[in-house]
Curated annotation (Swiss-Prot):
Binding, ATP: A315, P316, G317, V318, K319, G320, M321, K336
Function of the molecule: Bifunctional enzyme which can phosphorylate or dephosphorylate isocitrate dehydrogenase (IDH) on a specific serine residue. This is a regulatory mechanism which enables bacteria to bypass the Krebs cycle via the glyoxylate shunt in response to the source of carbon. When bacteria are grown on glucose, IDH is fully active and unphosphorylated, but when grown on acetate or ethanol, the activity of IDH declines drastically concomitant with its phosphorylation.
Record keywords, A-Z: ATP-binding, Cytoplasm, Glyoxylate bypass, Hydrolase, Kinase, Nucleotide-binding, Protein phosphatase, Serine/threonine-protein kinase, Transferase, Tricarboxylic acid cycle
InterPro entries in UniProt: AceK_kinase (IPR046855), AceK_regulatory (IPR046854), Isocitrate_DH_AceK (IPR010452)
Name of this chain's protein: Isocitrate dehydrogenase kinase/phosphatase
Cystine residue pairs: none
Gene behind the chain: aceK
Catalytic residues identified in the record: D371
Cell location: Cytoplasm
E.C. no: 2.7.11.5, 3.1.3.-
Annotated family: Belongs to the AceK family.
GO CC list: cytoplasm
Species name: Serratia proteamaculans (strain 568)
Amino acid sequence: MAAKLELLIAQTILQGFDAQYGRFLEVTAGAQQRFERADWPAVQQAMKKRIHLYDHHVGLVVEQLKCITGQQYFDADFPSRVKAVYTDLLPEYPRFEIAESFFNSVYCRLFRHRDLTPEKLFVFSSQPEGRFRDIPRPLSRDFTANGDVSAMLYNLLTDLPLRLPWENLSRDIDYITLALQQSFSAQQLAGATFQIANELFYRNKAAWLVGKLRVADRVYPFLLPIHHSDSGALFIDTCLTSKAEASIVFGFARSYFMVYAPLPAAMVEWLREILPGKTTAELYMAIGCQKHGKTECYREYLTFMSGSQEQFIIAPGVKGMVMLVFTLPSFDRVFKVIKDEFAPQKEVTQAQVMACYQLVKEHDRVGRMADTQEYENFVVDKARLSPELLAELQREVPDKLEDLGDRIAIRHLYMERRMTPLNLYLEQADEQQMRDAIEEYGNAIKQLAAANIFPGDMLFKNFGVTRHGRVVFYDYDEICYMTEVNFRDIPPPRYPEDELASEPWYSVSPNDVFPEEFRHFLCGDRRIRQVFEEMHRDLFEADYWRGLQQRIRDGHVEDVFAYRKKRRFSQRSGAALPATSATA
């Protein structure tokens, strides 16, 4: 009887995962229709819906299991036996890796993230690594130039499943051909093979054609973002063939792609060749499997720890008033714990901070907000904590610590990609690096605002610089929707004495923001002030912010590109493409 119960529980969990991934694919499959209809609000709703599906189905399975087991008492080894039976169901299962993560989620929900051991959880996968390369059907089609790149591109583009007309296909083919000729010789292109993914990758207002360009013994990305013109016809905005550009397109600060992937492991392996700098976790997250990406992220952390003797240290930079942040010197992640008590000037609660982080997870991050992974009961050996960090943890987050003898459990934390804090970057930057960073910072603010996100605290210390030189926001405790903010001009002083007073001569409500004040706390450095005034003076004007608010209220969804403005065909070729409301 007991063995039958363990099998029933294992089958219930796997069937629950089947239901979840079926709904995941169903929402994903609707991406083409949403794109063709230019239904951008539906795109945003689908993104949130797909993220919520996982936790919803975990909850359904947990309730089923409670009904199955009732009030029965089980011995301590019962969860281990269920895991063993579940493992036996996976060798022939096509999505075994995410099914393991789903099992972990159900276990954690049932047992409140306690007793997280390899005997009861899939800390590492139970299946051989080679299974990731078992592809039952090709994920891509091959196209060869045979000396005529334009003809090959015509065949490739007219073979796409999109049902909208092209605005000017011959023009786009000329643009792509020119871009290829600027990067490769005629001889290289004549013998090149283009491997094009069968599925388009949808995100925001674009459908991405993703491919591999094989030239001799080398492989390059081949990425074409397809957009709508104002008249509803299709056009291609650029052609990207460098791995650095591809890495940014699939970056950790962007929303997850909608790509139909019934075999996600196969898709991840296919992408790896053109995204060699991405970890397995990042690739799963890029295609929308963020919960399994979280599992892989933890596995990458464990692998690093097993091969290193480094101690955790307090992260470099200005200490936060809300978050305690620590890291490992050679690891590319930071760990963020919400402090038990905040500085007096921070009028937020822990629940509000967590809600802000969830908002970022669900919102269009437009390449400007870092993704985070949330963990509970994160166990660390005390010997791996520097004395300074251990003292800081005991001082700032004692309510979130559980002493386990030689180890310590942190009840809740976020893991996030490590970046160079912008304030530290600017201290070391030369003139050109400083100009580039300020341009990026202003663009980040504007793109977030266009996506209906107001950062709140805009100090440089709350932004980071990635290895590609992009500026990304990572401090979320004060973010809110743009439409919730009241942007005001500072009223003129009534008397000369007003300007000398310690208190403002005008009333200030909680949601009031005065953009004129940004100049004072952002532009203390004369060099930075000059560049800021040159590039982003509009950020100091309340009218600019109110104009953005009105566009949002009117239902306008901005175009945000995953590449610099100068990479657009309209900029590179000197020819006009259809007008878009870009904030690139």
